[in-house]
Amino acid sequence: MPLTVNCPICKAPVEWVPQSAFKPFCSERCKLIDLGDWASEKHVIPVKAEFDPEAFDEFDLDKGDFFKE
């Protein structure tokens, strides 16, 4: 008996088998809806900022000349 999961978009049951071309989605439509949500940044992966804007003040750098070559 194959594992059954719900489509993340429409909640339809999807069998988790090699023949399920769009798993975990039930169809290409739901797969594309999810892709569009990622592209429009409705979904994001939270990350810690690598750069702290307040660090400029600590180093007494001129912000206007920072990116000039």
Curated annotation (Swiss-Prot):
Gene3D superfamilies: Erythroid Transcription Factor GATA-1, subunit A. GO terms for molecular function: DNA topoisomerase type II (double strand cut, ATP-hydrolyzing) inhibitor activity; zinc ion binding. Pfam families: YacG. GO terms for biological process: regulation of DNA-templated transcription. Zn(2+) binds at C7, C10, C26, C30. Its cofactor is Zn(2+). Binds 1 zinc ion. The keyword Metal-binding applies. InterPro entries: DNA_gyrase_inhibitor_YacG, Znf_NHR/GATA. NCBIfam families: PRK00418.1 (NF001638). Inhibits all the catalytic activities of DNA gyrase by preventing its interaction with DNA. Acts by binding directly to the C-terminal domain of GyrB, which probably disrupts DNA binding by the gyrase. This is DNA gyrase inhibitor YacG.
